C-alpha cells in the first residue's frame, strides 16, 4: 500500500464503544431498499453509496449550483468530530432522509441532522492498543441498507448499527489485527443478480504487514459470511462456510517455488498481500464485483523472483490490478494486472469506474472500466471480456488502452496492447550486494504514493472527461533485506519522497480518455482529496493545505475556494434537500503523506490537524 520501513503508527488509547446523544424518531427514518441503491446515480435527495452510484462515477445530475453561481457558496453549518481524536479525516459521507452518516478517525461514526448540523448519535469502537494501521487511523466511509448502517474498524471487524439509535446489531471479526489485518475502506452493498440476494461486500487491509488480502461478502442482516476470496494465486476461497476453489491455478506458477519451504513456495507467497482495501463498484449486467487488488508483499521484488532470474518473468498474481469477482460464488472471473511483480508499491487499489467507451476505430460502445493507477497510467479495460476470463492464461487481454496522466514516469514507457503487459524500463531497484544491508538507490517517479493515490476520481458524462487528483513527485528508492515476522512491517525497501518539479506537486488532471491534458489547476502541496462532478458544470475537490475548491469542468478555471482550517484529504458529495442543493466534505489533515511523505511531509508540516465536516449551500439571493 503506501508507507515506509519505519515502525507503524501505534495507538495507545482505549476507545470506549458508545451510542450517545439523541436517537432518530422512528417516523423520520425509512428503510433503504436495493432499488434505492441501484438508482443512487440519478436520484438527488440522498447519497446512498460510496461513489454516488454502483458505477462509482461520482457525478450528480444536480445543477442548481452551477458555474455562474458557485462563487457565491457559503457555509450552511460545520460539525466538529470533537475531542483529541483528530488525525486524518478521509471519509465520504452518506445522506438519507435528512440524516448524514459520517465516519471519522479512530473508527467512529456519527449521525448528524443534515439541516442543522446537530449530532443525533455517535458510535466509538473499542480499539485495542495493538492495532497496526499502516497509514494513519483513518476510515473512508460507511454503507447503508435496510434499517442499518455498516462500517469497518481498525481492529479488523465489520460492524452493523441500527440507523435510528446507533446501537450495535452485529459485529464480525474477519482477521487477526495483531498480525496486521485492519479495515479502512467503506463497505458496499450489491445484489446477486442470480439469486436475488443482497450482499454486503468489503475487503481487508494489511499488505505492509505481510497478510494475504481477502474480499468478503456477508448477509447484511446477520453479518454471516457468504463467500470469501483471497487475492493471492493458489490460496483457497470459501463459499457458505466451506472451502470452495483456489484463486487461479492451485500451483501458483506466478510465484516461485522453494523446495526447502513447507509450502513448496517462497516465503512471500504465504504472506502475499493483494488486499482489496478500497471500495468496490458493481457491474450489474455481468453480476461482477469490481475492485482493485493491493500490492504484493513484501515490496522487495527479489523476494518474489526465483534466484538468479529476471523479475519480469514473475507476475505475483493476483496483486496490483483490478479484480472481477462473481457475485454469486466469489469466483475470480477475470483480472487485469497494472504492474506485474510490482517492485514500487504501486498497488492497484484506486477506484475502478464503470462507463461506456466509444471505440474510435469502430464507433461501437464498449462496456468498459477506467482506472487511474498509482503507476502513472490511466487504463481502460473491456468488462465483458473480463467476465469471460480475460487475464487468465491463454485468454486475450482486456486492455483497450493505457495512457500516462503524469509526467516523468521512470518505470515503463507504455503498454503493449496485444499482451496487456507494460513496456518496462530497466529501473527495478537492485539487490543488496553480498554483505551489504541495502542496495544501490535509484530515482523513481512516480513514487509509491503514486501519480494519484486512493483518492477517487470522478467522471462527467456531460464532458466525457475523468477528473483525477494527480501529483508530480518522486523518490529515492533502495532494496533492503527482509524476513517475515508476524506483526512487523514486511517491506524490504527504503525510500525518501522528494519533489519532481520546483513549482508544484498537486495537479487536477482531465483525461478523455486519450493523452491526458492538464486543466491548469496546479498547487504547491499534494492533491490528496477525491473529486466530484455535477450537471452544473463544475468539479469540486480539496487541497492538503486546507482549501475546498470548485473548478470549471471544461477548462479548469478556479471558480471558488474556502479555507477550512485543516488539510482536506476526503471526498465531497452533493444532494438536494428542501429545494436547495448542498455540498459536504470533511476536513482534517492526515493519512500517508504526513507520516511517510519525506520532503512532502515537510511541505505540509504547517497544516494543523482538525476533525470537522463542512456543509455549503447558496444564499437565497444567489439561487
Swiss-Prot record:
Subcellular location per the Swiss-Prot or TrEMBL entry: Periplasm
Domain of life: Bacteria
GO molecular function: calcium ion binding; oxidoreductase activity, acting on CH-OH group of donors
UniProt keyword terms in alphabetical order: Calcium, Disulfide bond, Metal-binding, Oxidoreductase, Periplasm, PQQ, Signal
Name assigned to this protein: 1-butanol dehydrogenase (quinone)
The species this protein was found in: Thauera butanivorans (strain ATCC 43655 / DSM 2080 / JCM 20651 / CCUG 51053 / NBRC 103042 / IAM 12574 / Bu B1211)
Result of knocking out the encoding gene: Cells lacking this gene show a delayed growth on butane and are unable to tolerate high level of 1-butanol. When both bdh and boh genes are inactivated, growth on butane and 1-butanol is eliminated.
Disulfides per UniProt: 134-135
The protein's role, per its UniProt record: Involved in the metabolism of butane. May function primarily in energy generation. Catalyzes the oxidation of 1-butanol to 1-butanal. Also able to use 2-butanol and butyraldehyde, although the affinity is comparatively low.
Chain residues that bind Ca(2+) 1: 40, 43, 46
Major localisation: periplasm
Listed SMART domains: PQQ
Region (Disordered): 235-274, 420-440
Family: Belongs to the bacterial PQQ dehydrogenase family.
Annotated catalytic residues: 345
Its EC number(s): 1.1.5.11
Expression induction or repression: By butane, 1-butanol and 2-butanol.
Catalytic activities: butan-1-ol + a quinone = butanal + a quinol
Any one annotated GO CC term: membrane
Cofactor note: Binds 1 PQQ group per subunit. PQQ is inserted between disulfide Cys-134-Cys-135 and the plane of Trp-277. Binds 2 calcium ions per subunit.
Amino acid at each position: 500500500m503506501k508507507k515506509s520501513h519505519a515502525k507503524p503508527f501505534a495507538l495507545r488509547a482505549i476507545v470506549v464503544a458508545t451510542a450517545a446523544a439523541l436517537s432518530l424518531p422512528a417516523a423520520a427514518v425509512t428503510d433503504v431498499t436495493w432499488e434505492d441503491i441501484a438508482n443512487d446515480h440519478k436520484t438527488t435527495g440522498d447519497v446512498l453509496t460510496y461513489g454516488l452510484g454502483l458505477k462509482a462515477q461520482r457525478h450528480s445530475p444536480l445543477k442548481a449550483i452551477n458555474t455562474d453561481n458557485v462563487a457565491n457558496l457559503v457555509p450552511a453549518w460545520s460539525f466538529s468530530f470533537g475531542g483529541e481524536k483528530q488525525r486524518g479525516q478521509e471519509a465520504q459521507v452518506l445522506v438519507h432522509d435528512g440524516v448524514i452518516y459520517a465516519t471519522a478517525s479512530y473508527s467512529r461514526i456519527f449521525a448528524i441532522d443534515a439541516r442543522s448540523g446537530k449530532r443525533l448519535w455517535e458510535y466509538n469502537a473499542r480499539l485495542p492498543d495493538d492495532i497496526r494501521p499502516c497509514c494513519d487511523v483513518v476510515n473512508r466511509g460507511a454503507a447503508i441498507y435496510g434499517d442499518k448502517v455498516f462500517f469497518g474498524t481498525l481492529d479488523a471487524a465489520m460492524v452493523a448499527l441500527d440507523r435510528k439509535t446507533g446501537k450495535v446489531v452485529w459485529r464480525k471479526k474477519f482477521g487477526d489485527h495483531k498480525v496486521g489485518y485492519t479495515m479502512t475502506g467503506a463497505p458496499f452493498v450489491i445484489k446477486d443478480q442470480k439469486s436475488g440476494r443482497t450482499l454486503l461486500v468489503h475487503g481487508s487491509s494489511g499488505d505492509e504487514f505481510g497478510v494475504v488480502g481477502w474480499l468478503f461478502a456477508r448477509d447484511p442482516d446477520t453479518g454471516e459470511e457468504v463467500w470469501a476470496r483471497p487475492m493471492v494465486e493458489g490460496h483457497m476461497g470459501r463459499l457458505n462456510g466451506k472451502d470452495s476453489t483456489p484463486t487461479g491455478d492451485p500451483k501458483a506458477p506466478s510465484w516461485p517455488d522453494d523446495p526447502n519451504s513447507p509450502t513448496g513456495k517462497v516465503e512471500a507467497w504465504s504472506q502475499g498481500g493483494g488486499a482489496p482495501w478500497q471500495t468496490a463498484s458493481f457491474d450489474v449486467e455481468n453480476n461482477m464485483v469490481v475492485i482493485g487488488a493491493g500490492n504484493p508483499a513484501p515490496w522487495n521484488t527479489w523476494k518474489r523472483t526465483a534466484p538468479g532470474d529476471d523479475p519480469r518473468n514473475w507476475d505475483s498474481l493476483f496483486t496490483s490490478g483490478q479484480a472481477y469477482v462473481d457475485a454469486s460464488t466469489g469466483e475470480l472471473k477475470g483480472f487485469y494486472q497494472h504492474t506485474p511483480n510490482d517492485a514500487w508499491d504501486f498497488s492497484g487499489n484506486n477506484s475502478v469506474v464503470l462507463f461506456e467507451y466509444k471505440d474510435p476505430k469502430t464507433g461501437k460502445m464498449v462496456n468498459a472500466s477506467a482506472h487511474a493507477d498509482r503507476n502513472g497510467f490511466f487504463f481502460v479495460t473491456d468488462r465483458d471480456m473480463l467476465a469471460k476470463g480475460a487475464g487468465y492464461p491463454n485468454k486475450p487481454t482486456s486492455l483497450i488502452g493505457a495512457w500516462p496522466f503524469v509526467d516523468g514516469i521512470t518505470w515503463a514507457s507504455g503498454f503493449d496492447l496485444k499482451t496487456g503487459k507494460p513496456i518496462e524500463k530497466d529501473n527495478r531497484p537492485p539487490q543488496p550486494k553480498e554483505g551489504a544491508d541495502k542496495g544501490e538507490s535509484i530515482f523513481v517517479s512516480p513514487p509509491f504514493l503514486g501519480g494519484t493515490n486512493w483518492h477517487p476520481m470522478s467522471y462527467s458524462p456531460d464532458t466525457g472527461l475523468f477528473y483525477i487528483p494527480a501529483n508530480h513527485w518522486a523518490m529515492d528508492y533502495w532494496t533492503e533485506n527482509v524476513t517475515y515476522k508476524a506483526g512487523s512491517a514486511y517491506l524490504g525497501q527504503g525510500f525518501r519522497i522528494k519533489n519532481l518539479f520546483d513549482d508544484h506537486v498537486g495537479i487536477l488532471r482531465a483525461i478523455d480518455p486519450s493523452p491526458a491534458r492538464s486543466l491548469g489547476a496546479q498547487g504547491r502541496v499534494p492533491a490528496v482529496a477525491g473529486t466530484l462532478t455535477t450537471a452544473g458544470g463544475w468539479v469540486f475537490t480539496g487541497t492538503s493545505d486546507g482549501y475546498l475548491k470548485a473548478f470549471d469542468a471544461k477548462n479548469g478555471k478556479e471558480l471558488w475556494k474556502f479555507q477550512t482550517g485543516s488539510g482536506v484529504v476526503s471526498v465531497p458529495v452533493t444532494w438536494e434537500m428542501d429545494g436547495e442543493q448542498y455540498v459536504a466534505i470533511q476536513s482534517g489533515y492526515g493519512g500517508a503523506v504526513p507520516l511517510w511523505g519525506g520532503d512532502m511531509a515537510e511541505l505540509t508540516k504547517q497544516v494543523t490537524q482538525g476533525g470537522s465536516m463542512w456543509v455549503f449551500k447558496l444564499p437565497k439571493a444567489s439561487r
